């Protein structure tokens, strides 16, 4: 069982400690306490340890150094007994913590990433069983993490315009640096004061701090600039760009930005369940509270040049946004058995959320125009303006706002549940009356209002599962839900702080309704070691909230407003099958097939020469009232005068992944093949119809010599075809290798050398495609490098004459543990194992 997540501690479970393994679907805490199966299960792997080998210490240290100043260090230490476990873990690396093994294909992480993570995790119980009077369990964790990212990104995109016109094309290059620090902690107390009552209390806290800076260049063109020679972006920013390029150029922009944010929060939850008998009757209570407070600040400088004769736009902006949020909720539930295997439930929940946000934006480029020349109200001689006075003088009231939200939510859930060994069925409906109150101020647009919205949502849901056997089941799920547009989207306000993207609200927005359907079948045959999984899902949205874009041909300015639209739906099917064959099942074959179809719609509009934007109007509109009135009408006229066409983008995706593995005592090998095909059709811009392919094939092998040496290698050819930019149609031969040697009597010390992307052909390309645009991107990443690792593993067992296995206090024989952190009832991260829930084995003598 492996977990390569850099956010988790990585530890090892030693073979000598393991008595039995048990893989099964663990019931939820609610089911264990009430006896009512709520269907919320998690596949877990319990490791049963030998009691005589408890009170043990496991300590692992992994130090790694590489070329290009790469490093990777990990540390893990844990001590456990029959009733307790405490773990310390940490890691530092600037490799993205990729781990090793298995060919690496498309979809690598973005940017050059460095991270640090340290944590403490503990659990203790008093040895009493669940539901036993006086049972007490304590636990908790504290974690610190820091991540830094250096990202270089290049993007070329095509914005679909109306029929009969060409698309708009954009190119951008950006470099950004970001860092974030996160500290969080949680305590857990589970107590059963008597056999009928269960109490769970969990306080939490967190702190986050982030910083970022970026610089970028971008340009917009009337037609595809790749039809000309050279790099479009480099050429348009040259001292003397070619006339052929400037003739199709619309604008070019340079931008610098930096920002920071801080947030602190505390919270907690409490659950109380009281059983009123052994037949499933119970009452429950849940309380939850959270408070957070923070602020963010941003600085930005933008310089925009237009190619239609319009004056250049230069902005130097600063914004400051303090924010405070708190919320609480109270939930009461009652469950009543009314027939054999039938149970009725009713729940009521009240929740309140308060959010206060004050965004102030300042145009620092206007400082030069400040004068103290008012003869009627000049300040005393010798007085200088304060920082607050200077900022107030250049405050952008038009784009500054103050908003206070108050959310009052009520929820009543009525449901019935039927459950036996074969069939589980539950259905219910939720009634959600909600009231939202928004106090909103926007001085520059003469808006000072309080808006109250009342809605009543109804959400039905149904779940059905049929258990053919312990390892074969069918499941059907349906859910319908409503979502409301945000309150600010319903206000008739304008934000033109970005001269190239002007956004508006829309008071006419309607709620959306989403239907979600899922069908699944999973099965596993332990004797044949064969597992299968098949699934189908469908999602459809009515009155979806889409973003309508009106594009100005002359300037490249985009006007954006949310609008309702119908016709968005998607469906997908996927299946997996794997099985073992040959003598002792040393061969395994696995196949994963997926299919999806997305029907995406969006509004596209264009206008020719809208004229001046609000920032130029402001130069000659002296009255704030006149300016606000003019711009509301002006921008609304942009949308009403532009013909909105519905663009339909249909995308069909199909994929197949095949893997053949062979495993022997000292050698194992695998052969892989992957094929992904995407077929997209655009109703307006048929020239943007694409058929793209991604395919790869390769092999991997591991050799383990009896003297402690091992060799691992993998190689794969990855290819792309069908992209509009020829540089994206690539062939990449990726080869990784590792050589390691273990030392000392028990092989506790290991020296390994790992080499990634030996042939230096890895690239990082991605695509986004919807009804409004097509965007292809490249970014930098950690690709080709080597690492030298020194790994030491120490296991200290207590002395015991009753076990032949405990003949030494130190042992280097090990294997990786589940989820990286052994603990009471420890669960591996992620979802169900691909082969289904394997066979259950005997109860533990001691479990961690």
Name every feature range the model reports, one short phrase each.
Residues 17-24:
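Phosphoinositide-dependent membrane-docking surfaces
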């Amino acid at each position: 069982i492996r977990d390569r997540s850099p956010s988790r501690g990585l530890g090892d479970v030693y073979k000598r400690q393991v008595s039995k393994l048990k893989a099964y679907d663990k019931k939820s805490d609610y089911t264990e306490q009430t006896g009512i199966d709520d269907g919320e299960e998690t596949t877990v792997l319990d490791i049963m340890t030998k009691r005589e080998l408890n009170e043990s210490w496991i300590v692992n240290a992994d130090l790694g150094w590489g070329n290009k100043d790469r490093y990777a260090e990990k540390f893990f230490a844990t001590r456990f007994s029959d009733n307790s476990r405490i773990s310390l873990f940490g890691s530092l690396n600037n490799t993205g913590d990729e781990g090793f093994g298995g060919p690496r294909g498309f979809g690598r992480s973005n940017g050059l990433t460095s991270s640090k993570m340290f944590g403490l995790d503990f659990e203790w119980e008093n040895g009493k069983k669940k539901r036993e009077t006086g049972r007490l369990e304590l636990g908790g964790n504290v974690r610190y993490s820091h991540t830094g990212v250096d990202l270089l990104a290049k993007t070329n995109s095509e914005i679909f315009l109306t029929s009969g016109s060409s698309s708009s094309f954009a190119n951008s290059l950006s470099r950004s640096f970001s860092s974030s620090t996160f500290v969080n902690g949680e305590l857990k107390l589970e107590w059963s004061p008597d056999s009928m009552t269960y109490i769970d209390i969990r306080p939490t806290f967190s702190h986050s701090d982030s910083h970022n800076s970026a610089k970028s260049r971008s340009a917009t063109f009337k037609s595809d600039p790749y039809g000309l020679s050279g790099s479009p972006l480099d050429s348009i920013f040259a001292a003397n760009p070619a006339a052929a390029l400037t003739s199709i150029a619309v604008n070019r922009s340079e931008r610098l930005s930096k920002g920071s944010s801080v947030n602190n929060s505390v919270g907690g939850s409490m659950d109380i369940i009281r059983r009123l008998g052994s037949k499933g009757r119970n009452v429950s209570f849940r309380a939850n509270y959270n408070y957070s407070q923070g602020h963010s600040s941003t600085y930005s400088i933008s310089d925009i040049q237009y190619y239609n004769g319009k004056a250049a736009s230069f902005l130097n902006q600063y914004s400051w946004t303090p924010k405070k949020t708190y919320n609480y909720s109270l939930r009461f539930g009652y469950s009543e058995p009314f027939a054999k295997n039938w149970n009725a439930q009713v729940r009521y929940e009240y929740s309140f959320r308060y959010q206060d946000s004050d965004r102030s934006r300042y145009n620092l480029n206007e400082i030069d125009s400040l004068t103290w020349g008012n003869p009627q109200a000049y300040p005393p001689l010798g007085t200088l303006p304060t920082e607050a006075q200077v900022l107030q003088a250049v405050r952008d009231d038009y784009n500054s706002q103050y908003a206070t939200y108050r959310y009052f939510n009520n929820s009543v859930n009525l449901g019935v549940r039927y459950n036996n060994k074969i069939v589980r069925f539950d259905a219910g409906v939720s009634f959600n009356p909600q009231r939202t109150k928004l106090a909103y101020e926007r001085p520059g647009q003469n808006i000072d209002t309080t808006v109250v919205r009342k809605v009543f949502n109804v959400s039905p849901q149904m779940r059905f599962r049929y258990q053919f056997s312990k390892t074969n089941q069918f499941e059907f799920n349906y859910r319908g839900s409503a979502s409301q547009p945000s309150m600010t989207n319903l206000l008739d306000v304008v934000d033109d702080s970005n001269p190239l993207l002007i956004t508006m609200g829309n008071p006419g927005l309607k709620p959306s309704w989403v239907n979600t359907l899922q069908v699944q079948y999973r099965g596993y045959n332990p004797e044949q070691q064969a597992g299968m999984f098949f699934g189908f899902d469908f999602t459809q949205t009515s009155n979806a909230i889409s973003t309508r874009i009106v594009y100005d041909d002359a300037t490249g300015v985009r006007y954006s407003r949310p609008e309702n639209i119908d016709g968005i739906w998607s469906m997908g099917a996927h299946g997996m099958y794997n099985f073992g064959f040959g003598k002792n099942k040393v061969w395994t074959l696995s196949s994963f097939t997926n299919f999806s179809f997305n029907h995406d719609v969006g509004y596209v509009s264009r206008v020719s020469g809208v004229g001046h934007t609000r920032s130029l109007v402001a130069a000659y509109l002296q009255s704030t009232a006149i300016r606000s009135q003019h711009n509301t009408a002006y921008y609304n006229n942009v949308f009403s005068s532009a013909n909105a066409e519905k663009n339909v983008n249909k995308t069909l995706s199909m994929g197949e992944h095949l893997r053949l593995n062979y495993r022997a005592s000292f050698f194992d090998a695998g052969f892989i093949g992957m094929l992904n095909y995407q077929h997209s059709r655009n109703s307006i811009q048929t020239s943007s119809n694409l058929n793209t392919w991604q395919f790869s094939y390769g092999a991997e092998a591991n050799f383990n010599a009896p003297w402690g040496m091992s060799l691992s290698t993998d190689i794969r050819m990855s290819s792309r075809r069908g992209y509009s930019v020829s540089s994206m149609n690539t062939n990449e031969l990726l080869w990784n290798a590792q050589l390691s040697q273990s030392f000392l009597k028990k092989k506790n010390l290991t020296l390994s050398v790992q080499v990634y992307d030996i042939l230096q052909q890895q690239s990082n390309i991605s695509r986004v495609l919807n009804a409004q645009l097509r965007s292809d991107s490249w970014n930098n990443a950690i690709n080709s490098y080597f690492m030298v690792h020194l790994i030491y593993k120490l296991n200290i067992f207590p002395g015991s004459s009753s076990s032949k296995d405990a003949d030494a206090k130190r042992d280097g024989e090990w294997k990786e543990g589940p989820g990286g952190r052994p603990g009471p009832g420890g669960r591996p991260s992620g979802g169900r194992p691909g082969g289904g829930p394997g066979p259950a084995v005997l109860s533990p003598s001691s479990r961690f």
